[in-house]
Amino acid sequence: MTHSAPSNPTQLPSDKFLRTADVRKAFIDFFVSKQHTHVPSSSLVPYNDPTLLFTNAGMNQFKDCFLGIDKRDYTRAVTSQKCVRAGGKHNDLDNVGYTARHHTFFEMLGNFSFGDYFKKSAIAYAWEFLTSKQWLGLDADKLYVTIYESDDEAFDIWHQDIGLAAERIIRIGDNKGAPYASDNFWAMGDTGPCGPCSEVFYDHGEHVEGGLPGTPEEDGDRYIEVWNCVFMQFNRQPDGTMEPLPAPSVDTGMGLERISAILQGVHSNYEIDLFVNLINSAADIIGIKNDNQASLKVVADHIRAVSFLIADGVLPSNEGRGYVLRRIIRRAVRHGNKLGAEDSFFYKMVAPLVKEMGDAYPQLVEKQAFIEKAIEKEEVQFAKTLAQGLRLLDSELESLKSGDVLSGEAAFKLYDTYGFPVDLTADITRERGIGIDEAGFDEQMNIQRQRARDAGKFDVDYSAAIKVETPTEFVGYEQLDEKEVNIIGLYQDGKEVEVLNEGDEGVIVLDRTPFYAEGGGQVGEMGEIRTSSGVFNVEDTKKSGQAFIHHGVVNMGSLQKSQTADAQVVSAIRSASARNHSATHLLHAALRKVLGDSVSQKGSLVSSEMLRFDFSYDNAVSQKDLATIERLVNEQIQANVETHIELMNIDDAMAKGAAALFGEKYGETVRVLTMGTTEIEDGIQKPFSIELCGGLHVKRTGDIGLFKITSESGIAAGIRRIEALTGMGALRYIQQADSQLTALANQLKAKRPEVADRVQTMADKQRELEKQIERLNQKIASAQAATLVDNVQTIADKKVLIAQVAGIDGKAMRGLIDDIKSKLQDTIIILVGEKDGQLALAASVSKSLTGDIKAGDIIRHLADELEGKGGGKPDYAQGGAPSSDKLTGVMQALPNWVASQLS
């Protein structure tokens, strides 16, 4: 962070062409010279705020500062914040590429005051930066401002202190159907900090359509909002009354792209230097001329959102943030395809982006290769279904005309089978003036979700139906039992009851409990709750709000509300769960050391039997790396170092390098777990593992006993999973593997160290036999080729060979085609082979004929008819399908189909 004025602040004379990078630097320099602390942009994944999908405003990272929860060592801040608006409440995706100012990614310049200066200084700073010849030097006669209708204080500052004519100050009242609901009144929520705001507008001139703010023509493009200054001065109460805040604050925002467009004398954000360079790069990479196509703007915009999201730890997936990222990538790929891109191209846009923005955001430079790899992998995956999906969509649209609607069933099939996000389908149909039945799509989606829920039902989410206002005090960190706790609630079938009798299944809520509730990946604990009249077996513990929900069965007698009880956790299960939980922390640290800091936790499951850890990584982890990871964890266990738990302020924890799980909600005070030996990095002592965690752990690393990885697999694109055992479970696994190795050695009549070599020898022999079989198949194919050439027919003046061949698989088919081609010139060859219940499809078209018909189209036709898959190049293509009763009819109809294609 920068705390003092820059030694060489950027000077920006008004007649100079300004690069976007210059504007960003000038803004920061200006406010640092006004004693603001330069705070770096926060991640696009909102830290400590699961209510947000993405960071979408400069104030997101300061939310707790405005609420008075987060006390920092500065009261003035300036930022250039990365923002994404795609998915969720704030979604600009559909408009990107078609308007002058919509983006998925943008930068928000902002200055903030936390109980320091207020309206007078905020307005003065904004005006100075915008109009001073030392800074941006905008023509003051082109600026208008809006204020909240009753904000006389802001009016007086603009009119009397700044000298703005009264007719240039526009009052905007409540225009959203409720008191204090206005374009010029900002609120954090239904209750809490809020206040009036004042916006600065720039007049692009009479040649652009549009009216002043507050007029019926305000949606035009003539008057463009440049800067918004929010004055948080009230605290809205639940009854709607406004109480003055003891320390009013300021939150401002100015879009970097918008102000750059004004300074560079262009109307569209896509005409500023940054976008011009990206658009030109997109045209060069795709191999087309830049004719200002909307699709080029889409590609240039989307590479920013995609690259920064991946740099901040988001990877393509089918849910949450990962699915929004996937939608953006696939939209860009489709627009590139529309422009003529035939191969993967989008990942090549990362390099031009790094050139434009790498200086301001070094993380782009550091993670360039990782970003490119992640994008390319998603491109390749989507390419497998893009062409098929587009053909299906084209066939659905053939019978529709402008103004019609594509059925929800068709849109859902494109989504479910071909990976087309519904907004991508809408993007394509909109180009033809056709809408989408979104309600029908949602209905199909709900049906699928219900099927998934029905298939996965094995238990009742009993905590969801129980709402308890009174929080439970957890006392289990240092003890397994607690005497004389109070039963404050009994529930059966989700309803509160006064008594649970023997055999009843139900839920007990206590005022204090030693039972750990499911959280942080660790399962809830088991044990018993005993009163003078009965015993309740606790089978699981969860949370409902701040209350702990103990689910189980009355084993003996009965329990009543308001009774006192003794609560006891099963010791052996607690110890085993603690071992596995601590091992996940050591595993996480080892993964980052071996695979790199880009690895981040995506989920975990910790039970008494095993542990499961999901993490971001693009490839399968090699056996060598797995062995290293396993060794590192066991070295920490062997070191038998004491674990340390400390409560501290969350900012202090982050400063120490503590890892946090994105999406988790943490309070101001957090529990920090430090494990393992201390190492020296960059001259600083750092523990092997340091994480925020509220779970149960061992006292010393040696208590884990032993760590053994049992599997590593992929569960989604870019997400890997490791399963492992600890303690006696790990020992039993190793002993079982040892026994299996001994049995295998006996079967092979070899010594144990010789088993691998003996198996390799057998595998080599099998491969040689398979090669011999393949050579025999090729001989059979060659023999068939000699007879097949006699079956050539003439269709539309072209030589065509259509034939079925027996006992030929896909591997042998290529050799057979080559043999036939050596005997026939300028011929279309279509062969279908059948072997072991599978059909092998192949087509070859002489290069002289590919202008008339393409091999890929032939195979796609056959694959569609026979419910198979396939594709390829214009001169050669292959495919496959299951054996089918349809084959005879398809082959009989094939000459007529070929004729229709050649006519």
Swiss-Prot record:
Keyword Lipid metabolism annotated: no
Superkingdom assignment: Bacteria
GO process annotations (BP): alanyl-tRNA aminoacylation; negative regulation of DNA-templated transcription
Chief location category: cytoplasm
Keywords from the UniProt entry: Aminoacyl-tRNA synthetase, ATP-binding, Cytoplasm, Ligase, Metal-binding, Nucleotide-binding, Protein biosynthesis, RNA-binding, tRNA-binding, Zinc
Homology family: Belongs to the class-II aminoacyl-tRNA synthetase family.
Protein name, entry field: Alanine--tRNA ligase
Source species of the chain: Psychrobacter sp. (strain PRwf-1)
